[in-house]
Amino acid sequence: MINRVTSPNRKNRFKAIIIGGTGATGKQLLNQLLNNHNCKLVTSIGRRPVFDGKKNDKLMDIVIESLFKLSSTEEYWKNNDVFFNCIGTTRNRAGGAREFINIELGISNEAAKMAANANIPHASLISAKGANHKLWAKDWIHPLLYIKTIGQKEQTIISNFSFNRVSIFKPGMLIRLQGEQTWLEQLSESKGFGLRVDTLASAMIRDAERVKFDPAQESPQFYIGNECIKSSLKL
């Protein structure tokens, strides 16, 4: 049985650290964490300021030249309860297959290492439905490369690090909010398909609250598919 967290409790309040806080889901996650009474402090590490540099008493916004230099941020990882990985890119945005792998897998692994070394008990990761680290893939076949690389990202955080709890969210198509949507996202949302990024963010926070309330829950915990993620908000 999973316990519902209904109101703020000093014992169950948590501190969070996030990478990918300027992305579609990461922005929503940050905003909701800052407005969540169970979260007492959020640290964001990225290449750009979040919220255009606007200040918030609950936000520690750490801007670095490159996420490949996460080792320079060691002090900020300490004394957190949950690490959120919202890193997400594509081959085109990254500049090529190797660059895509270096970002999705390389940065994710380095961040997981920083979190594990800081003894953060809970890691929460955005993956993708269908991700499979065992899949055959060539660099020039991006759909297969994407599925394999994302699968490797989730597999390494499970196998290579000693978190007390790992939560992996595997959504299908994601729908960004108005003003950021592609025509396909607009069409999908109008037909009732896809998962809004703010809903995914809410599910990740609800999961973090449950883990803080009951650390002995099963690990790793997979949330596979949009309907499963939506249903987790009702638990």
Residue ranges of each PLM-predicted region?
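C-terminal helical subdomain
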Residues: 189-220
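Short, polar loop motifs at secondary-structure junctions
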Residues: 44-51, 173
